[in-house]
Amino acid sequence: MPQTRVSIFDTTLRDGEQSPGCSMNLTEKVRMANKLQDLGVDIIEAGFPIASEGDFAAVRAVAAQCQNVKVAALARTAEQDVARAAEALKYASHPRIHTFVATSDIHLEHKLKKTRTEVIEMTRAAVRQARDYAEEVEFSAEDATRSDVDYLCEVLDVAVEAGASVLNVPDTVGYTTPVEFTRLVQQVRKRVVRDRDVIISVHCHNDLGLAVANSLAAIEAGARQVECTINGIGERAGNASLEEIVMALHVRADRLPFETGIKTTELYPASQLLSNIVGFDVQPNKAIVGRNAFAHEAGIHQHGVINNPLCYEIMTPESVGVTANSLVLGKHSGRHALALRYMELGYDITPAELDVAYKSFTNLADRKKRIYDQDLISLLSSTARAAA
């Protein structure tokens, strides 16, 4: 089955940095941007230039440094925002201005204090201004999933008429569900895009733990750009995780016939670099890049993995840049894993010695959360003394 290309829009440096405790200085942003370029993302959203001098400088530095990737700068639908974004992107080889305004009634009434008509005019003016500066303009309808669908489509249509070539449909507060989001993307595709050369993008937050599921549903419904972050960092509960989306498409190509330009073997190194920069480790059981993603403790699982890793792994550790899987020795481990670990440590033990060592091992594992190699060596010494 032929595969359809989906663009990866990485917003680690912009939305990701808004995650509490995840701020980066200019040097760190450039370092991370270079890694993202090596990873093969299509677009790097480098920051929000009007927000601060630091953000402006970071966008300018990333734009100058990363010449083999599109670089985007965020701007509200305000004249000074768009002008500042354009200035920051001055040295980009492939610049994109990403302008946005909210379209939900709750945002219009309580945040913007604007009427629907005023927001339409703001959209038209900002996109036109952005097109004067950049060949490529992306428009986002903030809080799209809580917006009136008829009004949302009206605003998006105005953005296309004004020159936007990418329409982003954000689930700003992580409110939607996969079935609901599928219908919304289909509506935008049918009523706004039609036969025009316009890309539908999605940007999902993880407040209900559905960011990746919603992103994949949107791709199936016709979205051809997905916005995401390394390790899923971002506002509140975070964004859709880049590595999870990419590997879902990679592993389930039978069900999801889509491809990206991501070098999957660079996923784990990119995750580790980000963690080192922000000092914010991913949870151990995080899919794809967590410490336990390829770790096995249960004895039945360990036996299967020893015989053939595919018994309990749907991808190889090496495919995402992890050197090997890990058999974690703990209270649920079996004899096969213990015997293998002794062999790796250079010990050739008999079945009888293994029986004695295993009994001592299970007793120790009931008392200790982690078993170290020195513990295993000590157990063997105790076994030898008992035999003597």
Model-derived regions, located:
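Domain-level signal for soluble alpha/beta catalytic cores
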Residues: 1-5, 11, 17, 71-74, ...
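A mid-to-C-terminal "edge-of-domain" accessory segment
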Residues: 5-6, 12, 247, 255-388
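Alpha/beta enzyme core
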Residues: 6-8, 18-43, 56-65, 79-200, ...
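Short, ordered loop/turn segments at secondary-structure junctions
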Residues: 13, 48-49, 74-77, 101-104, ...
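An N-terminally biased module of ancient metal coordination in phosphate/nucleic-acid-related enzymes
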Residues: 15, 20, 209
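Conserved active-site and cofactor/substrate-binding residues in soluble primary-metabolism enzymes
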Residues: 24-27, 31, 53-57, 80, ...
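Short catalytic-loop micro-motif centered on adjacent basic/acidic residues
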Residues: 43-47, 70-73, 139-141, 201-203, ...
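Catalytic alpha/beta core domains of metabolic enzymes, predominantly
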Residues: 176, 183-308, 312
